[in-house]
Regions:
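Mid/C-terminal beta-alpha module of Rossmann-like enzyme folds, strongest
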Residues: 2-13, 202-216
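N-terminal Rossmann NAD(P)H-binding glycine-rich loop of SDR-like oxidoreductase domains
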Residues: 6-36
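Structural motif
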Residues: 13, 81-82, 118
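Conserved glycine-rich Rossmann-like NAD(P)H-binding loop of the short-chain dehydrogenase/reductase
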Residues: 36-43
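The conserved SAM/SAH-binding core of class I Rossmann-like methyltransferase domains
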Residues: 41, 86, 155
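NAD(P)H-binding glycine-rich loop region in Rossmannoid oxidoreductase-like domains
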Residues: 46, 50, 54-114, 124-130
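Glycine-/Pro-rich loop/turn segments that contact NAD(P) or position catalytic residues
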Residues: 89-177
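Substrate-positioning beta->alpha
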Residues: 103, 166-167, 186-208, 214-215
């Protein structure tokens, strides 16, 4: 008598590209707890390896990856279903906009070659008349990723409210330490903040949308 062995469902594999940053640091453990197979990539492998003391990070495949070094992208993307793109080049100085576009083009090309099913990109909210080079670059980076053949879902988030968020902690320190402050005009600008926990929920859920769904 023959019997059919039970089918084994292999969980999807996600690459968190930019895993040493604020969002990546929080997203990796969340994906592991959701049952995903996770690979974390950053320019500095040592930074990621230092997290092995945390049992959650021991379940993560760690690799070095730099979108400005295309030769590192193939190994990082091999066998990946969903790739989270969380990097930028602001630390490079005045040329960061050009480098952001170059990095995005390299990543989109390598993701297509590796057979990645979807790229999830975390962008920023961009006002209609934006004069921030950083925000404009974030928008153009998403556009460049979409020029590739791999479907892209972009989440545009404002100030992220949570422990470790640079923008949030600057505001908190100002409020706690300065009873009176003369403020510049830009503090009157309206913004739509988002809690870190909510953003992580969205990042996980959009990766599970049907292939035909996507966009910004």
């Amino acid at each position: 008598m023959s019997s059919t062995p039970p089918s084994i469902t292999v969980p999807p594999c996600a690459l968190v590209f930019g895993a040493s940053g604020y969002i990546g640091t929080n997203l990796v453990p969340r994906l592991v707890r959701e049952g995903w197979r996770v690979r974390a990539a950053a320019r500095s492998l040592k930074v990621l390896q230092a997290r092995r003391d945390d049992p959650v990070w021991r379940a993560v495949d760690l690799v070095a990856g730099d979108a400005l070094r295309p030769e590192t992208l193939g190994p990082a993307l091999a066998g990946i279903d969903i790739a989270y793109y969380l990097v930028h080049s602001m630390a490079a100085g005045h040329d960061f906009g050009r480098l952001d576009l170059e990095a995005a083009a390299n990543f989109a090309s390598a993701a297509a070659a590796a057979g990645v099913k979807r790229i999830v990109y975390l962008g920023g909210l961009v006002p209609r008349e934006a004069d921030s080079e950083h925000l404009v670059s974030r928008k153009l980076t998403g556009d460049r990723l979409r020029e590739g053949s791999v479907p892209v879902i972009e989440i545009r988030a404002g100030i992220i409210v949570g422990p470790g968020s640079a923008a949030y902690e600057v505001m908190r320190d100002l409020v706690y330490n300065l009873p009176v402050m003369t403020t510049p005009r830009w503090v009157q600008s309206r913004s739509s903040p988002i809690a870190l926990a909510n953003l992580l929920d969205y990042l996980v859920r959009v990766a599970q949308l049907a292939p035909a769904e996507g966009g910004i």
